[in-house]
């Protein structure tokens, strides 16, 4: 199932996004009653996808990000691979959905895109063994860990650099069953203004999905809807006013966001 969050003529709701991926004109949004956790029930209302607006598919209580999880990205940033996952938090106020502008702060330059596979937690969990991680995952989506590099380098810690409003685009929906694809080996591609900037596979992660969930859940309780961004491969680079960033992950879809400088409409 593809679970989205939509603004329809009747308000905001979760919905099952039905139809062939890549054929938006033939896709529909089927409204889910209440929330998508457990076994969703449906209201009976539906709309053509073109008649609704896709929002961020989930409003997480927290966004946990994994840094330094691809060797090639570590190399391009001049670091060394960590023995254990390196994690940090983004505020949930950074979350935006598809086609919503990434707003560049006036006092930040350069600002980089970072295309990532994102895990969506399906139920409250703590101290989850790696082998049981899948039992606690609702599904997968796409994230962009937008980062103000000058602030990241000057501050020594990453909260300001990665916590600005709009610095966590997520979407376009949550895929609960990736079969026949394997989340441990998905193609990831980031395109800026039509130029391919990142091209990798999730199999190149240093710490895999099970290890990530085990590590984070040993530290903090994960709640339904929490997001885990699993790290970015090499190829990150600057985005500027007027750019368009599209991140595509095999089996999930494409997350696209325009870029504007703060203060512009």
From Swiss-Prot:
Q: Which GO terms describe its molecular function?
A: acetylpyruvate hydrolase activity; metal ion binding
The residues that hold a divalent metal cation are: 114, 116, 145
Instruction: Write down the required cofactor(s).
Output: a divalent metal cation
Pfam families registered for this protein in UniProt: FAA_hydrolase (PF01557), Rv2993c-like_N (PF10370)
Q: Sorted alphabetically, which keywords does the UniProt record give?
A: Metal-binding
What domain of life? Bacteria
Q: Could you tell me which InterPro entries the record lists for this protein?
A: Fumarylacetoacetase-like_C, Fumarylacetoacetase_C_sf, Rv2993c-like_N
Instruction: Write out the similarity annotation.
Output: In the C-terminal section; belongs to the FAH family.
Protein name, per record: Protein Rv2993c
Originating organism? Mycobacterium tuberculosis (strain ATCC 25618 / H37Rv)
């Amino acid at each position: 199932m593809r679970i989205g969050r939509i603004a329809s003529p009747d308000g905001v709701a979760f919905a099952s996004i039905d139809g062939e991926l890549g054929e938006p004109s033939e896709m529909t949004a089927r409204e889910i009653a209440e929330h998508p956790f457990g076994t969703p029930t449906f209201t009976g209302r539906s709309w053509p996808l073109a008649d609704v607006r896709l929002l961020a598919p989930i409003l997480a209580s927290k966004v946990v990000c994994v840094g330094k999880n691809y060797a090639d990205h570590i190399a391009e940033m001049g670091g060394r691979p960590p023995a254990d996952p390196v994690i940090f938090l983004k505020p949930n106020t950074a979350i935006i959905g598809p086609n919503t502008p990434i707003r560049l702060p006036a006092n930040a330059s350069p600002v980089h895109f970072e295309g990532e596979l994102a895990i969506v937690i399906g139920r409250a969990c703590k101290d989850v063994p790696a082998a049981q991680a899948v039992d606690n995952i609702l599904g997968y989506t796409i994230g962009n860990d937008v980062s103000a590099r000058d602030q990241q380098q000057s501050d020594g810690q990453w909260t300001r650099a990665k916590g600005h409003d709009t610095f966590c685009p997520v979407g376009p929906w949550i895929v609960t069953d990736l079969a026949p694809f394997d989340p441990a080996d998905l193609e990831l591609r980031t395109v800026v203004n039509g130029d391919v900037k990142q091209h990798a596979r999730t199999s190149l992660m240093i710490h895999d999905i099970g290890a990530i969930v085990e590590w984070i859940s040993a530290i903090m309780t994960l709640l339904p809807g929490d997001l885990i961004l699993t790290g970015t491969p090499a190829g990150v680079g600057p985005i500027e006013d007027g750019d368009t960033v599209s991140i595509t992950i095999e089996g999930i879809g494409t997350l696209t966001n325009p870029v504007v400088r703060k203060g512009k409409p």
